[in-house]
């Protein structure tokens, strides 16, 4: 079969286009605007998890405890953290965060740095550790575990001083090192205000931007 000059040119053009298409390399896309880091992407992929506010406030019916509550008021006799974890798992949640310490300063674990904790409550005859029970329940059901730790402590007499920051970080270190992997840490309520403060019953304000030295605290969390 003979081809005319025009037909030959058309065939040649098609071949050249095909070769060009096969050998072209697409340039990588350039991001427009801020790009999420690995921590932000991991958080986004969680999609759905529980935040449980369970602490002394559960028994005093207060949104914020004043700090003068007695450990004897905390006695959840029917507590079953495995039920919490099971329901969370069945609901499609991927993790649980618990208020390990709210603004009233009461600790759900037997912190060695304060007497204002479950170790002086009637629950489990003073031998309970709700943080441990819940962290183990989360592990059993394949859930991530996180903690909320209030920077503001209306119970501690040293709040507002440098001494308190050492106390706060000591408690944070306990939570980060004694209960397995912690996927998220919440800090909330850092302004200060009125409180019991070991019996002082006064108002204490702090500079929330400088008092806590957040960069150092955040570095502790990310180690």
Question: Residue ranges of each PLM-predicted region?
Answer:
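Sec-dependent signal peptide recognition
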Residues: 6-14
């Amino acid at each position: 079969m003979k081809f005319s000059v025009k037909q030959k040119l058309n065939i040649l053009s098609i071949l050249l286009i095909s070769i060009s298409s096969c050998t072209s390399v697409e340039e990588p896309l350039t991001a427009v605007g801020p790009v999420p880091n690995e921590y932000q992407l991991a958080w986004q992929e969680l999609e759905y998890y529980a935040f449980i506010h369970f602490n002394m406030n559960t028994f005093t019916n207060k949104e914020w405890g004043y700090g003068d509550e007695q450990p004897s008021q905390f006695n959840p006799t029917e507590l079953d953290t495995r039920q919490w974890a099971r329901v969370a798992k069945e609901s499609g949640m991927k993790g649980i965060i618990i208020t390990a310490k709210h603004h009233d300063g009461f600790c759900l674990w037997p912190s060695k740095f304060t007497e204002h904790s479950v170790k002086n409550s009637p629950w489990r005859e003073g031998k309970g550790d709700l943080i441990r029970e819940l962290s183990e329940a989360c592990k059993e059901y394949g859930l991530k575990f996180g903690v909320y730790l209030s920077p503001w402590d209306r119970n501690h007499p040293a709040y507002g001083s440098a001494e308190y920051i050492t106390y706060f970080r000591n408690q944070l270190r306990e939570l980060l090192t004694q209960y397995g992997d912690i996927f998220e840490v919440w800090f909330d309520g850092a302004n200060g205000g009125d409180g019991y403060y070991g019996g002082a019953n006064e108002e204490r304000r702090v500079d929330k931007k400088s008092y806590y030295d957040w960069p150092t605290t955040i570095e502790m969390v990310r180690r």
